[in-house]
Amino acid sequence: IPMQNKAFSMEDLFAFLNAGVSAFHSTAAAAAILEAEGYRNCPESAAWHLVPGGKYYTTRNGSAILAWRMPKGPLTGWHAAASHSDSPTWRIKTLDGADHGFARAEVEGYGGMLMSTWFDRPLSVAGRLLVRTADGVESRLVHPERALACIPNLCIHFNREANTGLNYNPQVDLQPIFGAEGGSLKDTLAAEAGGKAEDILATDLVLCITEKAQRVGLQGEYFMSGRIDDLECAYATLYGFLQGRGEEAGRGDIWVMFDNEEVGSSSRQGAQGSLMSDVLARIEESLGVTKEQSIRARTNCLLLSADNGHAIHPNHPEKSDQKLPVNMGGGVILKYNARQTYTTSGLTGAAFTAICEKAGVPVQTFANRADVAGGSTLGNLLGRQILM
């Protein structure tokens, strides 16, 4: 069933969450959906031959992806939705090591995470291998769908402070074990990718949990999954993008999923890179748009930065602003911050609220307590680059 004619399905969301075990895998999953919907891949290194009303996508680094629908008439503006492909995890620094009878691999933290949630659970590995071939270097996705590792907690007998506020040292406490000494993670991943260990030239690998997305609650009203931040929003906005029918002839539509939001978005595949501005420039050139027309079209745009927000924690309601309660199932959230770490202003908030009212979607307002700094996301970083 074409996505445009398909009702939103939690099972489809779960499939996307389960597939996105690394930024490379979530990008590949999104590309597969776009291909099935008739979008044509435009590699950045190739010449583009764009036509009015055409459907296209491009990727960068294999971990960021941007899809667009060309306007059918003279360009007048854009609708855009942005999210990110990465999630907090542990980046693997070394593939093979051993000590005290265990096979080991060194990791370092990626993004902001609750370290304690990584202990004592089955873990696997996901990402890409850069492999030597007869034709050069090839990128291969890899994800053994079985438990390969765990990060063992120190037992209570050796750590009496474990339940009273322990500070974890990631270099010491969060290093995983991969079985008994003598096993080789490099050999395992090479076999998984259909190659040889000696042909692996480099890797981009992370740890991932092995549990699948699932419903929870007495009525199945909630769900739990890894990587909800931000693949939930990535999938929801992709679904919405594919529902679009291009009612306005002069308006183009963009969906983008950047990488490296969790570490500041400053990479070439992040929101502070040139991916979106490069694509816009090539689209505008194909349409014969002048600089004047470009600026006018970009200012006639609504950019939605879609990332997760915080509902009231039932055990710690005092952590939320009680005057602005956000409840699970209460509707989408508009996030405001005086430090401008989100994109929402009075103008954009009003526009978004009006759109939601028309669609019958409830809207909640979120702001941190005045004594809590809160987080940030990519929208404000992107908006200042492309004037949207």
Question: What are these model-derived regions, one by one?
Answer:
Residues 2-388:
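N-terminal hydrophobic/helix-forming segments and targeting peptides
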